[in-house]
């Protein structure tokens, strides 16, 4: 498999403003065409209107970044932190500071310094465990080196294993070390069974620690570590959205023993300044969305512009990715619209016709479509061609044929699922997953991401030479399964075709609980593959920025679908809290 070729195709409160809630009395709507005296009974998912409407988004104002003094402080603090980072001595002290910078969300200011420090530590790898045999230090070194693409073996933890093959009993009370060990275990790759066993061991002991702590009053110096353990058990840092984690950690960091006040103050100011930038971007994107007028014609689709923008913040929040966020927000909204048309509203005849028109990619065929589909096709056609123009202008390559093809592939899988629903077909688990990795929309998302993000695109990197690139397939598997775990029960209740959980149950006679455990295991295995790609990022011909963004997409997916359908029904999950903390609620200064 050629590592540099990507396969994207079929081979593969703050005063939150709530609109008045609308209620839909039934699950089907009637549609009579003016041309034919035929009445179609169309389904409806009863999606609620947006929680944040256009006027509310336009009213956003971040009071913490208006003062010139705040911006001046940010510049001063930024350089003071840089000076501290460059002057700090001792490997463990350097690792601790890098970890704090990352968790506080300000490490993007010091990418070169961090890389140089980690490269030197990697060149001297093994000194920490040889000198200290400290579980926390060894684990943190392992985490940061793998996180930044340096090669380090799981054998680094062998020094903590007794002659009986188990972790030494003296580690039982080393909660700080066990927490770092637990976090390190999530960087496992395929066949690294020792790390997988380590995860089970650390999880068990940390869970016992939380249970024991609930029976007593924690000392002040234990509060920080207890909160960190609870957070990790809920979501390991490696699987968490970086911006969301930074917002949480800023509040927790001040409880840490020997915390650095300079880092804390700079992190708070920087978070608010970035949040203000994101709010301005969201206003512009909301204005674009409002100007399309689509929601006046397509009242059956999910109006989720804020949620879609939140996805892009999870993928890359840094200022230099403003254009990428704009493009991806548009792609997410296009996917949502088309998914709802295929999944809920369109008739089979309409969907087959629409798929055919998209494959031809010719506006001369638009008159064959019903009116609502004409609008959708022209919207898709114009937006994708504009992206293609931007890439041609900036990078000299015509990507429109590739973009058109990946949308065609996506709609063909949507159509397949619609046929399954109409005919009552129950696919095998393998059949479902072969279709599902494409219908997940990940190949579509990643192709657009690669086109606008990479400076080294070519026909070769976009051509389907490798039938199943590991990055694309692994990310697609995670989104497909995470989405199914969160939404399949509700979708089955409204009569949808079987999802992965049900297909696995039918095929293996497993219980729903067993099937869900299997899906979680597949998600974990997919992360192992992604970890392998991240570990070899420095030698991969794929841009590291692309690999990191793909991993971040998985983090958003698992966050959005952890407690239910956080995109379609955010009010029923924690998505509302997540969005408010990242986009609307500044850090008090």
Swiss-Prot record:
Residues the record lists as binding (2E,6E)-farnesyl diphosphate: 302, 339, 343, 480, 483
Tissue spec. comment: Expressed exclusively in flowers.
Residues binding Mg(2+) 1, per UniProt: 339, 343
Annotated knockout phenotype: No formation of (E)-beta-ocimene detected.
Keyword Chloroplast: yes
Domain of life: Eukaryota
Induction: By coronalon. Also induced in response to the caterpillar P.xylostella feeding.
Name of the protein: (E)-beta-ocimene synthase, chloroplastic
Native source species: Arabidopsis thaliana (Mouse-ear cress)
Encoding gene, per UniProt annotation: TPS02
């Amino acid at each position: 498999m050629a590592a540099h070729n990507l396969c994207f195709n079929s081979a593969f409160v703050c005063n939150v403003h709530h609109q008045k809630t609308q209620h839909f009395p039934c699950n089907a709507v009637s549609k009579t065409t003016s041309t034919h005296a035929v009445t179609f009974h169309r389904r409806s998912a009863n999606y609620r209107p947006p929680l944040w409407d256009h006027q509310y988004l336009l009213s956003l104002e971040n009071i913490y970044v208006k003062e010139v003094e705040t911006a001046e402080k940010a510049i001063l603090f930024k350089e003071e932190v840089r000076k501290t980072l460059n002057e700090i001595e001792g490997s463990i002290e350097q690792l601790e500071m890098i970890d704090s910078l990352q968790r506080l969300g300000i490490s993007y200011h010091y990418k070169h310094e961090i890389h140089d420090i980690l490269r030197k530590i990697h060149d001297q790898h093994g000194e920490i465990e040889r000198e200290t045999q400290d579980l926390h230090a060894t684990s943190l070194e392992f985490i940061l080196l793998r996180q930044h693409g340096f090669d380090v073996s799981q054998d680094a933890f062998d020094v903590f294993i007794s002659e009986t093959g188990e972790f030494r009993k003296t580690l039982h009370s080393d909660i700080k070390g066990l927490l770092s060990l637990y976090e390190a275990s999530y960087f496992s790759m395929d066949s690294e069974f020792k790390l997988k066993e380590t995860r089970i061991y650390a999880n068990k002991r940390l869970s016992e620690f939380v249970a024991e702590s609930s029976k007593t009053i924690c000392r002040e110096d234990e509060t920080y570590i207890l909160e960190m353990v609870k957070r990790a058990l809920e979501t390991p840092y490696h699987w968490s959205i970086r911006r969301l984690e930074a917002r949480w950690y800023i509040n927790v960091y001040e409880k840490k023993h020997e915390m650095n006040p300079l880092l804390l103050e700079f992190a708070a100011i920087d978070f608010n300044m970035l949040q203000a930038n994101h709010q301005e971007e969201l206003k512009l994107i909301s204005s674009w969305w409002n100007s399309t007028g689509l929601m006046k014609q397509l009242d059956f689709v999910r109006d989720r512009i804020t949620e879609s923008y939140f996805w892009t913040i999870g993928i890359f929040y840094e200022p230099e990715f403003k254009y990428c966020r704009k493009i991806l927000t548009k792609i997410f909204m296009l996917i949502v619209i088309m998914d709802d048309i295929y999944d809920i509203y369109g008739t089979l005849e309409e969907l087959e016709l629409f798929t055919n028109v998209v494959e031809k990619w010719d506006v001369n065929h638009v008159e064959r479509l019903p009116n609502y589909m004409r609008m959708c096709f022209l919207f898709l056609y114009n937006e994708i061609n504009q992206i293609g123009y931007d890439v041609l202008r900036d990078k000299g390559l015509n990507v429109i044929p590739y973009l058109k093809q990946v949308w065609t592939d996506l709609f063909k899988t949507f159509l397949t699922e619609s046929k399954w629903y109409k005919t009552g077909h129950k696919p095998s688990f393998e059949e479902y997953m072969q279709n599902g990795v494409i219908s997940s929309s990940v190949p579509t998302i990643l192709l657009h991401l690669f086109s606008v993000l990479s400076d080294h695109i070519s026909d070769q990197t976009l051509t389907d030479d490798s039938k199943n690139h590991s990055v694309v397939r692994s990310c697609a598997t995670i989104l497909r399964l995470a989405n199914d775990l969160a939404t399949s029960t509700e979708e089955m209740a409204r009569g949808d075709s079987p999802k992965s959980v049900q297909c696995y149950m039918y095929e293996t006679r497993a219980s729903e609980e067993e099937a869900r455990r299997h899906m979680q295991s597949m998600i974990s295995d997919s992360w192992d593959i992604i970890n392998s790609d991240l570990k070899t990022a420095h030698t991969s011909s794929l841009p590291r920025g692309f690999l990191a963004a793909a991993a971040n997409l998985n983090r958003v997916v698992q966050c959005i679908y952890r407690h239910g359908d956080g995109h379609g029904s955010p009010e029923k999950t924690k998505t509302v809290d997540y969005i408010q903390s990242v986009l609307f609620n500044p850090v008090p200064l």
